[in-house]
Each structure stands twice: as C-alpha cells, then as structure tokens.
C-alpha cells in the first residue's frame, strides 16, 4: 500500500515530524499486512469451499466428508504456505 494509493500527498507527509512519519509508515505497513491476510483468507475459503462443497447445500451443517475435506484442505494450504515462507527466508539468509 503506497502513499499514493491512500491519496496522501508528499507535501502533507513533509509536514509531519519524524515520530509521526514513522508511526504512519508503521500503520500503513500493518494495514497492508492485514489486507494481505484477509485476501489470503478469502482465497483459502473460496478454494477449499469449491473443492469440498461442490453441490448445493442441503443441511445447515456440513456432512462428515465435507467437514473432513475442509479441515484437510486448510491444513494442506497452511503447510504449503509455511514451507514456502521457510524456503524464502532460507534464500534470503
């Protein structure tokens, strides 16, 4: 998330003292991270739901096979995400 995306003018940023500028940068970084987590959660939900609940919903509760499939799907997604991050961190060092 850049300052331009938030319609923050550089002239406005220059009016801030160093402490406020640092706090604003941290806030923007936190918001970007939150946005990425929300997007990843949405993607995961959509992917696993499409895979595990392909038909119409007949009951207010998932049946056992759908529940198991969703749990496995989420676990595999998180495993792959963890391994990817571990690999990228290894490449960085």
Curated annotation (Swiss-Prot):
- A Pfam family cross-referenced in the UniProt record is zf-Tim10_DDP
What processes in GO biological process is this protein linked to?
protein transport
Among InterPro entries, the record links this protein to:
Tim10-like (IPR004217), Tim10-like_dom_sf (IPR035427)
Q: Does the keyword Protein transport apply?
A: yes
Q: How does it sit in the membrane?
A: Peripheral membrane protein
**Residue ranges for motif Twin CX3C motif?**
48-73
Q: State the source organism's domain of life.
A: Eukaryota
GO cellular component terms, alphabetically, are:
mitochondrial inner membrane
Q: Which UniProt keywords apply?
A: Chaperone, Disulfide bond, Membrane, Metal-binding, Mitochondrion, Mitochondrion inner membrane, Protein transport, Translocation, Transport, Zinc
| GO MF | metal ion binding
Major localisation: mitochondrion
Instruction: Tell me where in or outside the cell this protein is found.
Output: Mitochondrion inner membrane
Q: List the disulfide bonds.
A: 48-73, 52-69
Main function: Mitochondrial intermembrane chaperone that participates in the import and insertion of some multi-pass transmembrane proteins into the mitochondrial inner membrane. Also required for the transfer of beta-barrel precursors from the TOM complex to the sorting and assembly machinery (SAM complex) of the outer membrane. Acts as a chaperone-like protein that protects the hydrophobic precursors from aggregation and guide them through the mitochondrial intermembrane space.
> What is said about its interaction partners and assembly?
Heterohexamer; composed of 3 copies of TIM8 and 3 copies of TIM13, named soluble 70 kDa complex. Associates with the TIM22 complex, whose core is composed of TIM22 and TIM54. Interacts with the transmembrane regions of multi-pass transmembrane proteins in transit.
The similarity comment for this entry is: Belongs to the small Tim family.
- Record's domain comment? The twin CX3C motif contains 4 conserved Cys residues that form 2 disulfide bonds in the mitochondrial intermembrane space. However, during the transit of TIM8 from cytoplasm into mitochondrion, the Cys residues probably coordinate zinc, thereby preventing folding and allowing its transfer across mitochondrial outer membrane.
Tell me what this protein is called: Mitochondrial import inner membrane translocase subunit TIM8
Which species is listed as the source?
Answer: Gibberella zeae (strain ATCC MYA-4620 / CBS 123657 / FGSC 9075 / NRRL 31084 / PH-1) (Wheat head blight fungus)
Q: What lineage does the source organism belong to?
A: Eukaryota, Fungi, Dikarya, Ascomycota, Pezizomycotina
